[in-house]
Amino acid sequence: MSATKEKTYLKWYQKLAYGAGDLASNCSYGLVASFVLLYLTGTMGLDSAIIGSLMLASKVLDGISDVIFGTLIDRTHSKLGKARPWMLYGQVGVSLCLFLLFAIPAGSTTMQYIYFFVVYTALNAVFYTANNIAYSALTALITKNNNERVQLGSFRFMFAVITNIVMGFSVTGLVEKFGGGTAGWRTTALIFAIIGLVVNLSLIHISEPTRRVVIS
């Protein structure tokens, strides 16, 4: 007696598009995690200890927002489904804040610290959190096939690794190519912000199955 074949829900290109979502995420996460301190201390001349304290305070807010957005996504019912609206809105905010984070205006040092904290918190605790929680939830929403879920995770990991490697080798070179200093960082951040937004839009075409509501 042969085993029953598990139903499949996704085409190969949908799996690829889903995995590419981690490329979009790492365009922002990778740039901030690996290079924002270099920009803030090396180019802007800000104090690393103060920056570290501001980041720590922001992480507290980030932990709170995880719960909030998880609840909001679960309660969302729209034409795009539960997850995709938050992924779209979140990525727009991520891309905007990523550019602004590497475009700190000239002025008093105090105002620069305030500017950094506000933009950094908006990026991480609001928009990135909304996008990433929705992105993770999308796996369970688009397929019930366990093998496909594993494949989605593999595609996601592959794109994350590739993106981090490429960024590790290219970011400082791009900064220098575009003039170095504040202008170089600003242009480089803009490039990755646009890439992240464009790639994230590919996920909008992955449909969440319509769920029937049974009235007893």
PLM regions and their residue ranges:
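Membrane-embedded alpha-helical bundles of multi-pass transporters/translocases
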Residues: 2-207, 211-212
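Hydrophobic alpha-helical segments, chiefly the membrane-spanning helices
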Residues: 215-216
